[in-house]
Structures are given as C-alpha cells and as structure tokens.
Amino acid sequence: MTDFSDFRNNGYILKRNLFSKDEVSKLIRYIEDNSEKEDQARETFSSTGKLNITLWNHPSDDLFGKFSTNERIVKPMEEFLGDEVYHYHSKVIWKKPGDGGFDWHQDYGYWYHNACLYPDMGSCFIMLDKATKENGCLKVLKGSQKVGRIGHGVSDTPEQTADLDRIHELEKRHECVHIEANAGDALFFHANLLHSSDSNKSNESRRTLIVCFNTKSNNPYKEKGHASYSPLKISSYNSIMEY
C-alpha cells in the first residue's frame, strides 16, 4: 500500500525518523529555554488526570513555526487531504510522570463546533520523546474515521469524550493500536480518527508537538475564534537547523 491508501483506509500513517535527533533536541532546548508561550499554557483534565498543554493558532517565524510549516509535514498532509492546507493550530503537550491521558475522542468532534462544515482536517503528532505504553502513548482505533462524526458529551459522558456506548461497540470492531514510536517519528491522522491515551506511569516526561491543519475549501463559514484560511508559507526541509 502507498502512504495515501494507508491513510485513507486506516485513518493514519506513521512516518519513522521524519525529524532527526539533532532537530528534536534543538526543539526540546527551545521549549525548555523559551518562555514566550507560557501565558498560553493551561491544564486540562480527563477521567485519568491532568495534562499540561500550550496552544497557539498562528505559526510565528520562530522554531515552532519552522516545524509546524515544514515541507515534511505540509506536503504529505495536502496529499492525504486532497487540498491545499493551512495551519489551524499547534500545541505542545507535556505529559509529566503521573499525569493523566485523554479519553476517546475525535478532533472533528470539537472542530465541528468551530464552523468547519466538513471533516477535511488532520493532525501531525511529532514525538519529542520515546512514546511507549508505559508513558501513555497515543492509542487509535484503526479505520474508525470511516464511522463519521460521533457525538461528544452526550448523556453522562464528559464534554471532551466521544459517546461511550458507541466507543464500546467500535472497540469490538476496530483494532486498538498503541502508537509506540521514537523521538523524531511523526503520526499523520484524520480528524475523525478515534484516539486516546493513558496516564504516564513512567518516571520520565513525554513531550509531543501536535500540528493541526484545515483544508482551504473547508474554511469556517463564520468566525469562531479559531484560525480562518490564510496561505501557508511553507518552510524548507533545512529551515529547522538553519534557524
């Protein structure tokens, strides 16, 4: 199978060694040394505990921007989604020892409410540390993007969680895949793919940069506080190490 057919059939594709050890180390140092996004940091809570998340809508001309607009991410995403894409938002998740995970959800379960009519959206999940079952790596239900959008926050389900009755049934029909990966690997996945993660039971932090994209043709039909279409200035392959 090609990457395109894997993405269409399974809802995701894992690209090994998309970024080098030197590139990842440079970003980790930048995260640790740079406080310019501290005012955007927040804690979020799930059924398994808390997580630290920093989120921003517009890529700036800094090291974060060199990653989030890099041709290694943007060009495959345009191939997978079949359209020009633009930066929807990016976030750094810092899962410290003992921190919780995320309940089962679809990104489009949230983004639907941001006036995006279609699920023609996707994310690139870049590992900055080794991801294992022990430290709460991402889990996906393979092929679950084909189900379509599922209600979130229905009945007694938390607002950020997909309908648990449907999840229980889908778990019987779709393989649950733990995305164990190394630093520098990157997971591309569709906005309707069901995914979750467990708590970090290790003694080490797990850091991730997630870059989310919308397609040009799916520009929100009204203002909802998230990024509308703006042409993306794609960064070159070498722009990270040249920064």
What are these regions (language model features)?
Residues 14, 124, 187-189:
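Short hydrophobic-aromatic micro-motifs
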Residues 106, 128-130, 190-191:
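Residues immediately flanking
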Residues 145-243:
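Conserved double-stranded beta-helix
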Residues 83-90, 100-102, 120-126, 136, ...:
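Generic beta-strand structural signal
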Residues 114-133, 180-181, 212-215:
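Short, conserved beta-strand element in jelly-roll/cupin
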Residues 2-10, 15-115, 153, 224, ...:
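Non-heme Fe(II)-dependent double-stranded beta-helix
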